[in-house]
């Protein structure tokens, strides 16, 4: 959530930064904030008068005035009127705060000053390409979903029968490969300092609001309406909310977590896109990296986060590129973001496999996650970062295509062979 104080003090700057992302009008928020501050001033004045009246009553009684006399009676009547007015202001203030929050919640994060300005993905900037030497030269590579079905390791037809379109059943070596990928990713992240988390797959509305999925992406999520519970679209949600409404010590930072979970998305805006294969499913597995850090280190931590995602792709020897996203293509909560895209030879394109975002204090404000430094007054909001490390289904798709052999078999990447106990599928 954006800082109302920043909007109040620098409305033109905030409006200009928001314009880099789209059309957003701050004027209704500014007007409501002005009303709220006027009410706060009035409440402070009334509270001061109430305290003054109470003090005067006490002093007069102490000096010998008749507690039932007209002077004391008049003061008490005034005090009661002031208290009544204060009581009237309370719901009005509460309503104004709720209205301001309702207008703030749909606003995206402000893009970082270093984020390239642009309107769409066409203006993203490629900053790195790796692994061209690993691009397969086999001219007969077929899509991952075709080789998966030929090998008997993917069953889309039964996935549809069990659920609906955009579901798959992995069989035999397919299930084993998925599990091997997950184990390898988690082990690697843990080795470099991430602490594994297994948190709920069902979360409440407050949790989704804290990380920015609600209210904007309600239509993209699966909801259990009777219980006010939602299936998570990413484990970033449950991992970040471990610390919701907490004050950490500066010594606890940085916090690194990794988590494997199934993720669930309705893909409401993806009609007709990637209708076959593992690229866009309603249920998919993902290993997520989450960092909670000191604001002064978040930019450095962002680069490390990208490197941790890269390390998985490099270990698997999967060709990829990195894009720096422009302001118009940023995710809702991101201030700065790099997308890692893996090479899929059957289509001759790079496809997103990880999105590494620095959300700065945007989620921390919504989730009320702060930290306190020793010998310093007050608290600060933490900075948060998240990134896929990696999307498991897309990793499998990339392996099935990049490691496809001329004879129709698929070689298991060397780093996964100890988990699989085999060299080929």
UniProtKB/Swiss-Prot annotation:
Query: Where, by residue number, does ATP bind?
Result: 265-267, 352-355
Biased composition of type Basic and acidic residues is found at: 57-70
Tell me where on the tree of life, at the top rank, the source sits.
Bacteria
What is any one GO biological process for this UniProt entry?
selenocysteine biosynthetic process
Which Pfam family would be a valid example here? tRNA-synt_2b
Residues engaged in binding L-serine? 234-236, 288, 388
Annotated localization: Cytoplasm
Q: What is known of its domains?
A: Consists of two distinct domains, a catalytic core and a N-terminal extension that is involved in tRNA binding.
User: What is the name attached to this protein's record?
Assistant: Serine--tRNA ligase
- Top-level taxonomy: Bacteria, Bacillati, Cyanobacteriota, Cyanophyceae, Oscillatoriophycideae
